[in-house]
């Protein structure tokens, strides 16, 4: 199999948040969502999907700060990438109020060194996004004066799968499952463009058992996910002592057998896949953080998504249960998981 080198770029930043690149103030939460709260995690999930599909990957902007287009173009043009995907989110109007503009767009530049190939990639990604999400389509368009499209030395596309100024699509920005949908469908589009079969995310049978001494793309993927969970390890594709320690710590923190071996149960937990465990006040871990992210996307205030099921999270769960005709006991079992894990929905304006 040919080795393809895939770059991923996210627009704007979150340390600090890029001024103006945000939704109107969200009701119930009384804060806006910022564009990079969608762009960055979706980029990361796309890179993870590419690793699973045996691509080499390059993160154009690993830092949280906004980075100039010229700096990013310079980085990109040093890499000899097969292609580049940039993640953004659209807006319409003044940005202070919500409106009806909605839907998915993908973009390319006719000034790119490979305009026909860039358009073909934009069309393939667009097709997969339409099939794999519930978003309406706005089409594939050419843009000028966008440096990451026209000034790079590789095939390049930009995708914007929604509008920050549309109330329902604003909520989707911070929905982890919508982020995953966009990332995975974008990877499907890349696979389609490259003529390669796509390896699905949610089947743990696609993930090999890893242990100390393992090497390769799935070790890169493991290390990448661990770093996103706060473990300070080098992402080098080699399962050594530091990766072993991080795996053991992750297993301990999430109620798994702490043997340092990454089998089906550990992969399922790393990916936060169902069946999801019953959680309640006092619990911790990745499933609690996922719950908190889902509640936030549905506009139930709880504080930060820190993976700790405290009183604020319990109050949000009870409110969600009351408003969705569930037993309001503050315990997240199968029925509450089914309701909260839907993509989109939540409180209305």
Residue ranges of predicted features:
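Acidic, Ser/Thr/Pro/Gly-enriched interdomain connector segments
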Residues: 196-235, 253, 268-307, 346-349
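Conserved hydrophobic/aromatic packing and binding residues within compact polymer-binding modules
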Residues: 247-250, 317
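Active-site-adjacent mobile loop/cap segments within catalytic or ligand-binding domains
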Residues: 2-7, 15-16, 78-79, 84-93, ...
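Structural recognition of the beta-strand scaffold that forms the well-ordered cores
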Residues: 3-8, 56-61, 82-87, 105-108, ...
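Active-site histidine-acidic residue metal-binding/catalytic motifs
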Residues: 1-73, 100-102
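Second-shell loop/turn segments in exported
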Residues: 28-37, 60-65, 108-115, 169-176, ...
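Active-site-adjacent substrate-binding region
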Residues: 114-141
